[in-house]
């Protein structure tokens, strides 16, 4: 982790930790680094979730990018993994997401994907941080026709839905599913995708107002979904977080399927089809021992990394593995995506359910979780840096 960039970019309370001034500096620094590395005027995509502060930060970030000569294509409200996919499809030089994922609405963040669809390498983030530290003093500002342009891109959701539809495949006809979109970025994609795949869908958390993202809904608040599934007689429930890079689920009895369980089910299906590269699933040190023991019993190897999907992805890419993720619901399916994708994960899980002929509770019962206690500690950027320095 760098001084400003954590495992998921720059994050903090919008207007306090993450100010407009900071967003503009990030934009200027990123545009300068990309111009230097590509040798041309960079094209940069920007997507965001539904937070009230998103428009403010996008305006400041865009001003910073354009002031150094980068062209910006605004995607509007789209899931984080959509930006990672579209930056490759549209052959852009980078993609930026303005989101704080599963966090409350007062938080926001800025995460940058390279033109490859992967998060920026550490050394590139360090270059941007160096520019931030000196207030971008050494970066010349563009003038005249050198100033960047801003365009609104309206085809992003359509192209992303098409990608998901082709990647998921299969027929979900006969499934009755309750889907919680966390009042976040997943709503429009979900409403187009899952009915098209054949599922009968009821949606929760699809009325964002800028303030209600993740508020009692989504993957960090499963109670309402679990209750709705049981009372409504649904086959299962699906929950995304605010930017849809996470997916959790519950069975028809209202019992949770966490990221470990979803990874285990998908890894088994991939193994059966000869698609489990390296016969290995990559998880983090937070994964439950029950998951590890089950995978051993099925002849599948597991590798553990530090907490953070960034570290999971690094291990997968270095070793050629196809699936990995976190207990929290980040699942990376490297045959189809370069980052965790909640809606892709949900589609693959629902396809597995439809093809199995079983109830979701039967799939959920493949192993029992061992007793486990996880404790979250709140720390600001300075405290995190001090902790890392003391390791």
Go through each PLM region and give its residues.
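Phosphate-binding and adjacent anionic-ligand microenvironments
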Residues: 236, 273-391
């Amino acid at each position: 982790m760098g001084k400003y960039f954590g495992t998921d970019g720059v994050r903090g309370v919008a207007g306090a930790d993450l100010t407009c001034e900071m967003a503009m500096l990030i934009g200027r620094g990123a545009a300068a680094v990309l111009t230097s590395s590509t040798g041309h005027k960079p094209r940069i995509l920007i997507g965001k979730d539904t937070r009230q502060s998103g428009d403010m930060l996008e305006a400041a970030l865009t001003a910073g990018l354009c002031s150094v000569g980068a062209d910006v294509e605004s995607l509007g409200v789209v899931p984080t993994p959509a930006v990672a996919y579209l930056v490759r499809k549209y052959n852009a030089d980078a993609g930026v997401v303005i989101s704080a994922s599963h966090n409350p609405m007062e938080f926001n963040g800025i995460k940058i994907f390279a033109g490859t669809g992967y998060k920026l390498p550490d050394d590139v983030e360090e270059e941007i941080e160096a520019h931030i530290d000196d207030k971008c003093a050494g970066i010349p500002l563009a003038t005249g026709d050198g100033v960047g342009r801003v365009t609104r891109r309206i085809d992003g959701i359509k192209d992303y839905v098409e990608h998901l539809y082709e990647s998921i495949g299969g027929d979900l006809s006969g499934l009755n599913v309750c889907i919680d979109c966390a009042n976040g970025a997943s709503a429009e994609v979900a409403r187009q995708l899952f009915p098209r795949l054949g599922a009968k869908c009821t949606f929760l958390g699809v009325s964002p107002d800028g303030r209600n993202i993740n508020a009692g809904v989504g993957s960090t608040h499963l109670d309402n979904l679990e209750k709705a599934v049981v009372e409504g007689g649904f086959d299962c429930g699906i929950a995304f977080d605010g930017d849809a890079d996470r997916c959790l689920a519950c069975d028809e009895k209202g019992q949770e399927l966490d990221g470990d369980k979803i990874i285990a089910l998908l890894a088994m299906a991939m193994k059966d089809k000869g698609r489990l590269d390296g016969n290995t699933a990559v998880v983090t040190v937070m994964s439950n021992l029950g998951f590890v023991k089950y995978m051993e019993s099925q002849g599948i190897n597991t590798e553990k990394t530090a907490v953070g999907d960034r570290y999971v992805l690094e291990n997968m890419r270095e070793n050629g593995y196809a699936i990995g993720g976190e207990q929290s619901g980040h699942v990376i399916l490297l045959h189809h995506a370069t980052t965790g994708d909640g809606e892709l994960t949900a589609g693959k899980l629902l396809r597995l359910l439809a093809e199995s002929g079983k109830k979701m509770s039967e799939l959920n019962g493949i192993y029992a979780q061992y007793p486990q206690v996880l404790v979250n500690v709140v720390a600001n950027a300075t405290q995190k840096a001090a902790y890392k320095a003391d390791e």
